[in-house]
């Protein structure tokens, strides 16, 4: 596992963004871990978060022209990612956001920032049902742009209602890559190498056996 992945997991644990234990998800599933990126909520947190996204983007080799952050959680992520790419890699990319509701005054419209053109890198925290991606795809298509890839913090590698995960459905429906800083397998690798967390291994393995994608 790359060093930045292990560092990200440690960072998420230190900020209580990632917790191990027993948690009831909205789906009703009992999960042995919980991830809430909304707890990255200080300037220092967001600066580090952006750096991890930037490292993952660079490691992926993905090609893109514009960074797009879907409302609302994607807005601060897109901002900190663009700053981190410039500060750490001297890569200067334009940023675009959308409003949930279009404005008919001021600058108007549904988009804020650079606009959508060329190859789009969409950044968000997680993909649960894929709703934000589907809404974003409408905007991207309306602007004759192309979704190059989606970058999220955590890929749960978990089935939805069928055999595919929401991420696999997005990849299938839009022929794009969904990339992540870390995934469930990375969490497992981290736990296996960290004695203080090995008590959670049986529950994590059982969860993967029951809900993990093939």
Swiss-Prot record:
> Which keywords label this protein?
Glycosyltransferase, Magnesium, Pyrimidine biosynthesis, Transferase
Keyword Glycoprotein found:
no
Question: GO CC terms for this protein?
Answer: cytoplasm
This entry's Gene Ontology molecular function terms read:
magnesium ion binding; orotate phosphoribosyltransferase activity
**Binding of orotate, residues:** 34-35, 128, 156
> What is an annotated GO biological process for this record, any one?
'de novo' pyrimidine nucleobase biosynthetic process
| Stated name of the protein | Orotate phosphoribosyltransferase
